[in-house]
Amino acid sequence: MSFTDTPDGFRSGFVSFVGRPNTGKSTLTNALVGEKIAITANQPETTRHPIRGLVHRDNAQIIVVDTPGLHRPRTLLGERLNEAVKDTYADVDLIGFTVPANEKIGPGDRWILEAVRKVSPKTPILGIITKADSVSRDLVAAQLMAVHELLGGNSEVVPVSSTSGENVETLIKVMTDLLPEGPKFYPDDHITDEDTNTRIAEAIREAALSGLKNELPHSVAVEVDEILPDPERNGVLAVHAIIYVERVGQKDIIVGHKGQRLGRIIHTSRQDIIKILGQNVFLDLRIKVLKNWQSDPKALNRLGF
């Protein structure tokens, strides 16, 4: 039996999570997949491209598309990210509108909902209250009612905690019921369709973002140059990658005092890269200044945006 052979009544489809930056979309994606495929950080606007995570059940296959948070762009990169998100909305079967339990609904949420409905007016919307373990049950109930009122109609709303796992299976069941009948798109052993270089670059960027403040996190980009067998170490892969920043002062911050910060980035990301490649790794990481790359069309094209 091939992975394309599916039982009667099998459901499948694409679900996109939308919401303001830092509402827990990437953490929720990881919880649903059961493995880390999307990087997470305390800074908003961490996700920079749609990431597909695969959720497998006996009666369904759900392709979760984790997108960058919709925001009012300040750079050409921001504009391109918003366009990529809107393109994603138009191609999915279900939209999960995420609102954190610990923040009141505001103008940003309404702006996003309006943008989603403008781009994809016929796609059903499911309300998802994230971070449900961060507040009392009374506040979760109040947020549930507020989101239901915002969405209107017969829209369902599910509170969920990605960290404790509370209601994760309930959310999967609700999403399954809202998807059409269809085939399996991927084999059961696949958890993402991300290519290896992208996953490695994201692992390095996640380590680099740790502890950064203000605007510096937005100025960090990573490019994997090449992956080759290490000529000096048997059974080891040499991963050569570049961290780009926009100014010389930012480079100094990434390197840190006597290179200590760069050393931590290499140590942390190397552990994730070993898991991705399933092999021991030597990580060669360089830092380069690519001036104002967030607003430079050529630089953005080079970095895949």
Swiss-Prot record:
One of its GO terms (cellular component) is cytosol. Residues 45-49 are annotated as: G2. Residues 130-133 are annotated as: G4. Residues 66-69 are annotated as: G3. GTP binds at residues 19-26, 66-70, 130-133. GO terms for biological process: ribosomal small subunit assembly. It holds the Pfam family MMR_HSR1. This is GTPase Era. It comes from Corynebacterium glutamicum (strain ATCC 13032 / DSM 20300 / JCM 1318 / BCRC 11384 / CCUG 27702 / LMG 3730 / NBRC 12168 / NCIMB 10025 / NRRL B-2784 / 534).
